[in-house]
Curated annotation (Swiss-Prot):
Protein name: Small ribosomal subunit protein uS15c
Assembly behavior: Part of the 30S ribosomal subunit.
Pfam families: Ribosomal_S15
Places the protein is found: Plastid, Chloroplast
Natural source organism: Psilotum nudum (Whisk fern)
Gene: rps15
């Protein structure tokens, strides 16, 4: 279930790049989603999940504005939907 960062980003960029942060947040979202399927009344975990989703969304918005090609590549590799644009 863990996401292999070497498939997505280079060795130099693994530490704190936007791409690696999005990958780690996606992994945490998947883990919390599985947890909430078992424990549907765990409201504090649900609140934490919403917080992580908002953080990932803001990083994805930042990535679309600064490096759209990298954004396209990342969402295709992670299996995410495109952001809604107004």
């Amino acid at each position: 279930m863990a996401i292999d960062l070497s498939l997505i980003i280079n060795e130099k960029e693994k530490k704190g790049s936007i791409e690696s942060q999005i990958c780690h947040l996606t992994e945490r979202i998947k883990r919390l989603t599985l947890h909430l399927k078992k424990h549907s009344k765990d409201y504090s975990s649900r609140k934490g999940l919403y917080k992580i989703v908002r953080r990932r969304k803001s990083l994805l918005v930042y990535l679309t504005k600064n490096n759209f090609v990298c954004y396209e590549k990342l969402i295709s590799q992670l299996g995410l939907r495109r952001l809604k644009t107004h």
